[in-house]
Amino acid sequence: MHKGKKNYPNLITSFRMNLKKIILNHDRFSHPERWKTNALLRFTFVYIKFLFDLMIIKNPLRMVGKTYRDAVTALNSLQSNYANIMAIRQTGDRKNTMTLLEMHEWSRRIGYSASDFNKLNIVHITGTKGKGSTAAFTSSILGQYKEQLPRIGLYTSPHLKSVRERIRINGEPISEEKFAKYFFEVWDRLDSTTSSLDKFPHMIPGSKPGYFKFLTLLSFHTFIQEDCKSCVYEVGVGGELDSTNIIEKPIVCGVTLLGIDHTFMLGDTIEEIAWNKGGIFKSGAPAFTVEKQPPQGLTILKERAEERKTTLTEVPPFKQLENVKLGIAGEFQKSNASLAVMLASEILHTSNILEEKIKCSSNASIPEKFIIGLQNTKWEGRCQVLEKGKNVWYIDGAHTKDSMVAASTWFRDTVRLSKRKKILLFNQQSRDANALVNNLYSSVSPEITFDDVIFTTNVTWKSGSYSADLVSMNTSQEDVEKLKVQESLVKNWNKIDDNRAKTHVTASIEEANELIETLYDEPADIFVTGSLHLVGGLLVVFDRIDVK
């Protein structure tokens, strides 16, 4: 480093913190309607967004040690910050057409071309609701064929308790040791290589890909080094411009139920969202989707399949699964499990393990190993039931209208006959939280009434700190500290709740758990839903209690 640049990282940190205060506190930035009429303001904020991106991603934290904790700290330095995300939302800057070109370049710099990933025999899954569950089902089915497929990779997002959950082999998160090993192999390769600034002007020396892109690169590196015979990849957001879409030749693609989500990136309509999701389709790789897709979305998916010179087949729920207890609870999971059956069938047939593909018919016969795989699927935080002392916890993360309706319906149907006290624990920090609570309330009422409702933040510990793997920079720290979302939720709940449940606000998940333990001497049913960060944080709190 040149002598004149010795204090550059400190200057960056200082400037970044002061700039953030200006942005978050300036009155103009809190009024979206002013963006429409003030071109200079829009330009200024986009430029500020660029500076934030430059400061955070272009100059990520430089590590001395190479432990797992060091890896997580370094990875967290690649997260997009709240101001950056808000700038994208406000300006409507949905598309970064350089994403895939940059992913190819990042791959080159760590020693791979996209064609190297073809050997992983990939299942590529997109959708709005259920894609993680479908990926888990598919991986579990393939895992029943260990003799022929000794290692199955699984890449999903987000994680609940540990970032290692995103990169699994044979259903288990890779170890802390392997995560750190492969993480720093990728990190160091990026540090020791450069890109042409003429072709990639943002990829200055020392720069790194963002959080999700880095993890995607890490997953490819890990699965290749571990000699995985087949891998299941869940899309991050959308499909067309998702970083996983450098996959050139998947064996098969799947699309779970479509809905409205990530509108600032994918569009405001089902048609736009379907177009983005269909971007993962590839020539020669058959595509499957669940039945009962929104008609407009299905039409677009079919058009995308034709455009990409492949087929799209709707998968009906298999009758053989009607009486099967799936590893992931919820009646709606039968559709995801059926889709997983067809995806796994393609992999196993292509690998010459199944002589014939399973017929895509509700009356088709499903092999016993498939059934076992579906029954043995483990997926924390999705329709999960935990007994803790005198209480029973019903846990299901949900961040869209459709997923909230499904989660709430599952809870309602499961506890309908229970006479226990009912408690709701909820948070959603980065989406329309009040709308989700309204969906929740209308889905459980009038059969279920809550005695107590607790709105918390996603902060893990009452000390104000987060579990290292759960640090998130994409929410307003000011809103968290002032409990703005939680106070708004209380007001909204009091308007819609005829039963007049007692409402509470806590500053951390640990405090919410302690409050619940003291509310009643008698047993209670507790419904935990909303943010997956809340779900993951609660499970981390439980883990610490169990250790004690």
Swiss-Prot record:
Q: What is its EC number?
A: 6.3.2.17
* Entry's localization field: Mitochondrion inner membrane; Mitochondrion matrix; Cytoplasm
**GO MF annotations, alphabetized:** ATP binding; metal ion binding; tetrahydrofolylpolyglutamate synthase activity
Q: Where does Mg(2+) 1 bind?
A: S157, E234
Q: Name one GO biological process term.
A: one-carbon metabolic process
Q: Which domain of life is it from?
A: Eukaryota
Q: What is this protein called?
A: Folylpolyglutamate synthase
Q: What is the lineage of its organism?
A: Eukaryota, Fungi, Dikarya, Ascomycota, Saccharomycotina
